[in-house]
Amino acid sequence: MTSVTRKGIRIMAEIISGKVVSAAKREELKERVKALNEKGISTGLAVIIVGNNSASRVYVNNKKKGCEEIGVTSFEYALPEETSEAELLSLINELNNDNRVDGILCQLPLPKHIDEKVILNSIDPAKDVDAFHPVNVGHIMIGDFTFLPCTPAGIME
């Protein structure tokens, strides 16, 4: 424990290693996925990226690597910048109905000609990895933290 003083208030804080916590969480998830697989239940994450945003590409590659590390099947959909909103909605509809896909992540930002709100609202709330769908935001707002997206869940843990 470390003592920190801010504005005359003394706070006790514990310095943690993000790498250590993350490695432990990956091992825990790996075991959970393995247990599901042993029961004949497979897990899948669909990641959609539209365009060539380099920061988004890094994020998507990290998700793919993370899935591989813990045994989750990763489905990547790299679409060209000129993909229409209708085409993207069609893909999301297919993924919403695909039993191999448990989670859908549509990487933001989307090209300017695509309405992010329309796209995010089209993802099945039960498969909405980022919890951007109004149903999931509503659960979080009333204190129902049954499902939290990765970043807030990591911060709270």
Residues covered by each model-derived region:
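Short, well-structured alpha-helical segments in soluble
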Residues: 87-99
